[in-house]
Amino acid sequence: MKGIAMLLVSCLLFSFLSTNLAKELKWCPSKDVFNGSCTDTGSPSYTCFLDLLGSKSASAMPKNCKCTPLPHNRRQCDCFVVCDSN
């Protein structure tokens, strides 16, 4: 019984910590242009998600990506990323 209580308390503490960390993140718009079409690696949003991960870092955590086709086999990716702390 003690083990179950400790597990529940641990889960509650973890959920409070993760909720507080998520509130501290600030999201900034990011616009980048890449070669290729919007569907090079799947859906347009997934293609841009992978592009941003490759050009920035995983800590940028891109989300809500939109892809806009451009002339000359290029694409513009508009995503929200975690703002730099600088």
Swiss-Prot record:
Pfam families: SCRL. Transmembrane segments: none annotated. InterPro entries: SCRL. It comes from the Eukaryota. Keywords: Antimicrobial, Disulfide bond, Fungicide, Plant defense, Secreted, Signal. GO terms for cellular component: extracellular region. This is Putative defensin-like protein 244. The gene is SCRL11.
